[in-house]
A protein has these predicted regions:
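Nucleotide-activated chemistry modules centered on ATP-dependent adenylation/adenylyltransferase
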Residues: 1-248
């Protein structure tokens, strides 16, 4: 598939996970504008947020890349696959597979499950996370001055990302506006942006996030875990150890 000509592309925007609504509208509008620039069809699906919360109930404190994320991927890929089948498309793919913040196997398995429901449809699995592809992604983002999203999208990701930031003495996430919680509001420097998605930064974030997930909803235990982590990070910074950033 990667070597075949692709002459009919449609962007199907179905992301009921994105919270709050303002962040959702910002991301959607940017997609619409870029599609218009490239002459690509854009399908604006419903903001089905009530259904998303219903399907993820009981998973509020699951870690990133956990069961909640699988449910989230499945929900969106199922809807994309249905649209593709009903409108004669041969394949589906997802930008989620381009991010090192995502477990590519988890993403691909979701896409494959969704596509397997239809005999005339396949899921396009490709290695989008190479250094070359990551740099290309950030070159495009900088050229277009895309809005820099500071977390994955859902309210639980927003909560956990802000917890991680507090533990690292990083300002909390800002929704919209011309100022980000950290760094630039828009992509401007491919080298800096790619560094923020280095494997080292990603691994560090998930190591801490998984520990918080084990604590769950207990506020006292979460606070204690964050304080322990924060003290360790201060010691590492004093020793000259790497202190990463958070750029989704």
């Amino acid at each position: 598939m990667a070597n075949d000509a692709i002459d009919d592309v449609t962007v199907f925007f179905y992301n009921p996970n994105i919270h709050p609504r303002r962040e959702y509208e910002i991301r959607k509008e940017e997609n619409k504008c870029y599609c218009k620039k490239l002459g690509i069809r854009f399908i604006d699906c419903d903001y089905d947020v009530e259904n998303w919360y219903a399907r993820t109930k009981g998973m509020e404190f699951d870690p990133e890349r956990g069961k909640r994320c699988t449910v989230c991927f499945d929900m969106r890929m199922e809807r994309a696959a249905l649209y593709a089948h009903e409108h004669g498309y041969q394949a589906i793919a997802t930008t989620n597979a381009t991010s090192r913040w995502k477990d590519v196997q988890q993403v691909n398995e979701s896409g494959q499950r969704a596509a397997s429901s239809y005999d005339d449809l396949c899921y396009w699995a490709y290695d989008w996370q190479t250094d070359e592809m990551t740099m290309r992604k950030y070159q495009i983002s900088a050229n277009e001055r895309f809005y820099k999203q500071e977390y994955c999208g859902c309210s639980f990701s927003l909560r956990d990302s802000n917890d991680w930031r507090r533990a690292n003495d990083i300002p909390k996430i800002q929704i919209g506006g011309d100022s980000a919680g950290l760094g630039e509001r828009y992509f401007t420097d491919p080298l800096v942006d790619a560094t923020e998605e280095s494997q080292e930064v990603v691994d560090e974030f998930f190591a801490q996030a998984n520990k918080l997930a084990k604590v769950g909803a207990d506020k006292k235990q979460r606070k204690a875990a964050l304080e322990t982590y924060k003290e360790r990070r201060k010691n590492e910074a004093h020793d000259g150890s790497f202190n990463g950033l958070n750029n989704w």
